[in-house]
Amino acid sequence: SLYLTNFNTENVTNMGDMFSNCRALTTIYASSKFVTTLVSNSSGMFRNCEKLKGEEVWTNDKATDKTYAKIEGGYFSGGIPRVKYADGTLTFFLTSKETLGENEYELNSGKNFPEWIKHSLGITKVVFDTSFANARPTSCYKWFWWCDKLKQVEGIKNLNTKEVTDMVNMFCDCRDLSSLDVSGFNTGKVTDMSGMFYDCISLKLLDVTNFNTANVTNMQGMFSGCPALTTIYASDKFVTGQVTDGSNMFSNCINLKGFIEYNKNTDKNNSEF
C-alpha cells in the first residue's frame, strides 16, 4: 500500500508512469489534495497495477492514465485519520471525508492536547479500526489521559507507531485498565515516555520487549503509581543511555519484581527488570 494523504499535486504537470509496474500494489490512500488539474502527461500512470483496488478495480481494459486517479469512482482509497467518540467508545479510523462529523476529531501533533480529551471521563472502550493500520501518527501525547473508566483497547495491532516521537502520559490514569498489549509498538523515534503508564493502578503485566528506547531522553514517572504491576517483560533494546530524567520511574510499584525486587530507589539507575 501507499499512503499519500499529504500529497498536494495542484502544481504537478507530469504523472507519466507514476505507479507503473507496481504489480503488488493493492491500495493507494489519498485525499482531495491529490488532483490532476494541470497534468498534461499521465501516460501509463497505472500500467500493470494488477492488484490495485479502490472504488474501481483495476482491469486490463480500463484506462491507465489519470482517468482513475481519484477516490470517488477511482483507484484511490480515502485515508484521512480521524478519531470519533460515541456512546463511551473512542474509535480511530481512516476516511475519505475531509469534513468533521459530530464528536469527530483530527489527530493531535507534538505536545498539543488531543481534542477528544473532553470525553476522557466517559470513555470505556478504545477501538483501532483496521483502516487505521495505514495511518502514521507522529504523536501519542496524552491520547488516553484521564480515561479512568477505560477497560478495553481493541485492535491495538492497527496502531503503527513507527513515526511517533512523543508518548508522554499516553495511558496516564487509565485506572480501570487491567491488561494492555503494547508488544507491537515501534518506539525507535520516541524521545519522551514520561508518565506513559502513570497511575495505571489495575495494570498487572506489561510486555515492552519490542521497545527500542535508544533515543528516549525522558522516562520520568514512566511506570509510577502502578501498585498491581508485578512483571515488566523487556529486552536489551530497552536502554537508558540517553535518559536525562528517570526520576520516580518506578515509584509505588510495590509489587514489581524482576531480576531485583522493588525498593524505594525508584529512578532509572535501579531499573533492572
Segments and roles (model prediction):
Residues 1-13, 23-39, 50-66, 122-135, ...:
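Structural signature of tandem-repeat unit edges
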Residues 5-8, 18, 45, 143, ...:
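C-terminal per-repeat helix/turn "cap" of leucine-rich repeat
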Residues 15, 42, 140, 167, ...:
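Hydrophobic face of beta-strands forming the core of extended beta-sheets/solenoids
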Residues 20, 57-158, 165-172, 194-198, ...:
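Surface-exposed repetitive/solenoidal architectures
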Residues 43-45, 54, 112-118, 222, ...:
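Small/polar residue-rich beta-strand/coil "junction" motifs that cap repeat-based extracellular fibers
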Residues 44-49, 66, 248-251:
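Long, ordered, amphipathic alpha-helical scaffolds
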